[in-house]
Amino acid sequence: MEFSELFKKRRSCRAFKDIPVTQEQLQAITEAGQWAPSPLNQQPFQFIAITDPDVKAKVQKSGIEAKQFVADNGGPGWAKKYSMNFVGECPLIMVVVYDPENGGLGNYFDQPHGALQSTSACIQNMMLMAADLGLGSLWFTFFNPASLKQVLDIPEKLDVAGAVMIGTPAMEAKAPPRKAPKIHQNQYQ
């Protein structure tokens, strides 16, 4: 597939077929992530591949608790109706963690986010590779990071960038319309 079509093919997927992701697919997806740019080539990201139904249920529970907290504390109205079923049903959950101290410039120039930025590029690469392999994916962030870290025994010094749901899509997702790019010439106008 041409790259110009690949990024348009990638859609957020919340319905998956009960087909396992193969080790070859997992390897290709994580390798694509590993090739993401990072400050000083520090590659601050690591992956937790979750296929065990009991562990997926714990991740799902973390999402349900976050959803309830948001709904109970005046969050957007859609939060109460948001279904978390896909979390337990997707064949593979890739939790992507990173070391916030490996971000290049660190706190110089008030730019402490290099590690998160490169981990975001890593996740995008993973999702593009999944699409290239005919898999669907979803970058999921609707969870309490502290709860998820506890559930997965993630060391305190690491942060969670997201949980990427990956599997064979149960249906084709339609692309929502995109806004026109806002391009400023030479300075912000």
List the model feature ranges, each with a label.
Residues 98, 142, 168:
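Short secondary-structure boundary segments
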Residues 3-13, 161-189:
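C-terminal helix-cap and adjacent tail motif
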Residues 100, 143, 162:
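Residue-level "edge-of-site" marker
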Residues 37-40:
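Glycine-rich phosphate/pyrophosphate-binding beta-alpha loops
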Residues 1-20, 24, 28:
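Short acidic N-proximal helix/loop "leader" segments that mark the beginning
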Residues 43-119:
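Glycine/small-residue-rich phosphate/adenosyl-binding loop
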Residues 29, 33, 94, 104, ...:
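Small-aliphatic-rich amphipathic alpha-helix that forms the alpha element of a beta-alpha
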Residues 148-160:
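Short, electropositive alpha-helical surface patch
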